């Protein structure tokens, strides 16, 4: 998710002030070590803030399997942090060095860490453009370096002389298993990385299309709690039930796939973001939504400028999203009860923030909590998107 410079400055200020709570999703490893539901909720909430500075998630498991067909490819995804983010393997450079990258549907470009398995000096196809870049991901400290051009492939689909940021900073993760970020957002949205924009260097999917590797700039993302599938340049009909519904992509101006719908009857425009854990909107809009729900106690934090809800775990309300009136999706019980406080109370997977612009009173971000229930087809050269139940 990207915003204007003005909006980002305010958000980065909040993020920088909140560094006492680590944004590093290596702390999701702490989920396995017995971190409380309250701490986990705060970590995930801080990631929502970090998304507005292009936040990502470290901690990576095993490799991915690839199925390549003419005109496209399908890749198995690795679930990260208990189904809150998803990773894929990429091969970079003339030696095809393998780097594990997090899929980020809210960021257009790619980032490769200097301490990953990729070494520019060992790749005969590498070119250091000398063009500087800066990308703030987690604390606001930032990742900076130079933009490199080299071959990058996923699932056997190679983008030649692909532009990515090469950085010695690790403001996106201290986890050595994660070597980069692979942006998947649509082109043309607000872009505050001028080094890429000034030269017309686009993201991975658009580059594949421009170079004739795929016929259509598109991907299908099917996320699951224990993995998932990414299809590039094609659609895998086995990944969904029933029919794919074709809808107007109301998130295109934001670089997302998005649709109009309702959450428990309240109208919103939903922006799909694989890098966000739950649901996020502006402070006032989320507060009003929660106040309208029976049995919900508001939890407000002035320091972070955040609001969420606390409920009895045994009387958990339902979150039902209507997808443009075509079908309904109910968030799963494991998602709704993920933030168990251990005293019979649970925090809800929804966040409101004062630093989110007014447009996010109507535009709400929906992440993995919703996307785990659907299969989404995002088309770059169309004003439409497609979606179906898994």
Curated annotation (Swiss-Prot):
GO biological process, one term: proteolysis
Domain Peptidase A1: 86-388
Gene Ontology CC annotations of this record: extracellular region
A Pfam family that the UniProt record links to this protein: Asp
Stated induction or repression of this protein's expression: Expressed on human skin of healthy people and patients afflicted by atopic dermatitis or seborrheic dermatitis.
InterPro entries noted in UniProt: Aspartic_peptidase_A1, Pepsin-like_dom, PEPTIDASE_A1, Peptidase_aspartic_dom_sf
Domain of life: Eukaryota
Propeptide stretch(es), residue numbers: 21-69
Entry keyword Lyase: no
TM spans (from-to): none
Active-site residues per Swiss-Prot or TrEMBL entry: 104, 273
Mutagenesis / variant outcome for changing residue 107 to S: Does not enable protease activity
Residues of the signal peptide: 1-20
SUPFAM superfamilies registered for this protein in UniProt: Acid proteases
Localization per record: Secreted
Glycan attachment sites: 62
Function: Probable inactive secreted aspartyl protease. May promote an inflammatory immune response in the host when the host skin barrier is breached. Has no detectable protease activity in vitro on fluorogenic substrates, a peptide library, or with the general protease substrate casein. The presence of the enzyme also does not affect the activity of the secreted aspartyl protease SAP1.
Family: Belongs to the peptidase A1 family.
Protein name (record): Probable inactive secreted aspartyl protease
Species this chain originates from: Malassezia globosa (strain ATCC MYA-4612 / CBS 7966) (Dandruff-associated fungus)
